Structures are given as C-alpha cells and as structure tokens.
Design a protein with these regions (language model features):
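Switch/coupling sub-region of P-loop NTPases
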Residues: 2-123, 133-134
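Conserved P-loop NTPase
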Residues: 123-178
Length: 178
C-alpha cells in the first residue's frame, strides 16, 4: 500500500524493487533502500545487523531484509520482528518446516542459546513462512505456505495454509515437461 513506510536492507547490491510510480513516473510510496558496506576497519564496517538496529528508530511499517546468511542477521531480524515491526526476508531452505530450523541453526553459530528458545523466537518472529521452488520446467512456484503457531517439546506446531500439488506432468511436442 502507498501509505506504508518500507525500508529495505540488502547486502552488496540492490535486488528489492518496491518503488511504485504512477503513469507520469511520480513515486507513490515511501521506500528507503539501504545497502551494507563491508570494511576491514571495524569502525567503518556497515553490516545488516548494524543497519537493522538503526532502522527501528525510523518507524518503518515493513522492513525487508535481503537474504539471511549469518547468525547476527538471523537473530537481529527476528528480534526486529518481535518488536512489532513486519519483517520480510529470504533464506535458502528445503521446505517451510526446515526454514525455521535453518534460521535457528544460523543463530546458533553465534549465540549460545537453547534450541527450543531459538525456535520459539523464530516461530514468534515469523508466523508465516512461504516456500518457493523452481520446478523442472524452470518455472518458480509457491509450493507451500504455513502458519507457525508454537514450538513445544522439540516439535513445531504449524498449520498448512496452502500447498501446491502437481497432479499431472505433460510433455509437449518439443519434449519439455510442464
């Protein structure tokens, strides 16, 4: 929506394209794009964790965090979400359920916290997980959407909201499967 303040944080290059324009090219929404700036000098190093801390002071409606790859990003993005901000991010995983475990194991690399506590943090921070996959025909599909409810006794409690199911594969005249 045009009345939402969006702030994106990305590493290296800008991939999010969230600016909306009208037919005359006027910008309709409020988007601030931030990029990390790695430096060997710690005083000059600007990483995602550093930017996340500062973004919270700007009162965003939505924070877009580029691909989650490190322990600091994993926990700081989750903590930002737990402050009431909507945080959208991407991460490589094999399924909706494994996404929570992947975020937890990333955080575990740096933070000596109990697995169940980290998993509860991730489920609270990211109640909705969307899993996409590239299929054999090279199309990318949303395979599943789940709503994480809780993590108890070493078990994720989640509800499937959507599941893509392939009912039939068809081979066309060129031998391509669709």
């Amino acid at each position: 929506p045009n009345n939402r303040r969006l702030i994106t944080i990305e590493e290296g290059s800008r991939e999010f394209d969230l600016v909306k324009r009208d037919a005359q090219g006027n910008i309709l929404n409020s988007v601030v794009h931030l990029l990390t700036r790695p430096s060997e000098n710690p005083a000059l190093n600007i990483n995602q964790d550093f930017l996340l801390e500062r973004v919270l002071r700007k009162h965003p409606d939505v924070i877009g965090v580029g691909e989650m790859r490190s322990a600091a990003e994993s926990l700081s993005a989750a903590e930002s979400s737990r402050t009431g901000h909507t945080v959208c991010t991407t991460i490589h995983s094999n399924s909706c359920n494994s996404t929570y475990r992947r975020m937890m194991t990333l955080a575990k690399r740096k933070y000596n916290m109990d697995d169940s506590i980290l998993m509860q943090i991730m489920v609270e921070a990211y109640p909705i997980i969307v899993f996409t996959k590239q299929l054999e025909d090279r199309s990318r599909k949303i395979m599943e959407i789940i709503e994480g409810e809780d993590y108890q006794d070493g078990r994720l409690i989640a509800h499937s909201l959507y599941k893509y199911e392939v009912e039939d594969n068809v081979t066309d005249d060129r031998g391509e499967t669709r």
